[in-house]
C-alpha cells in the first residue's frame, strides 16, 4: 500500500479557496471529481505546481511532476467541494493515512464554520 505525506502547500491553497468562498457545499463527488481527461486538460494549461495544489496528499517515493505523486484531490480545478473533503477524510481514514485524514478534517471543519 502506498504511503502519503500531507501536501502542506495544498492545505494552504484549499484553505485560501474556502476563505474566498470558492466552494460547493452540495455536490455528487462521484460526478464532480476530475476525470483523467479533465486532469490532462488542466495540465495542458497549468503547471504541475498548480495541479498539485488541489491535492492534500503526496505519494511517498513517486516522482514529482507525475500524476502518481499527487493524491486526495478535493476540488474540480475551480472550486473546493465539501463532498471532496468528506471523501478525502473517509479514504484516508479507511487506509490509515492519519495525517492526511486530520488535514482534510480540519479543512472540512473550517469550511463548515465559514459557510455557516
List each model region and its residues:
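A charge-rich, low-complexity, intrinsically flexible signal that marks solvent-exposed coils, linkers
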Residues: 1-116
Amino acid at each position: 500500500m502506498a504511503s502519503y505525506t500531507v501536501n502542506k502547500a495544498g492545505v494552504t491553497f484549499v484553505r485560501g479557496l474556502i476563505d474566498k468562498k470558492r466552494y460547493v457545499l452540495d455536490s455528487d463527488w462521484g460526478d464532480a471529481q476530475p476525470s483523467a481527461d479533465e486532469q490532462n486538460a488542466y495540465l495542458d494549461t497549468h503547471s504541475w505546481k498548480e495541479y498539485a495544489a488541489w491535492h492534500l496528499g503526496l505519494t511517498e517515493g513517486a516522482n514529482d511532476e507525475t500524476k502518481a505523486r499527487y493524491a486526495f484531490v478535493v476540488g474540480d480545478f475551480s472550486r473546493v467541494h465539501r463532498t471532496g473533503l468528506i471523501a478525502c477524510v473517509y479514504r484516508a481514514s479507511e487506509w490509515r493515512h492519519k495525517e492526511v485524514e486530520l488535514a482534510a478534517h480540519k479543512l472540512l471543519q473550517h469550511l463548515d464554520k465559514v459557510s455557516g
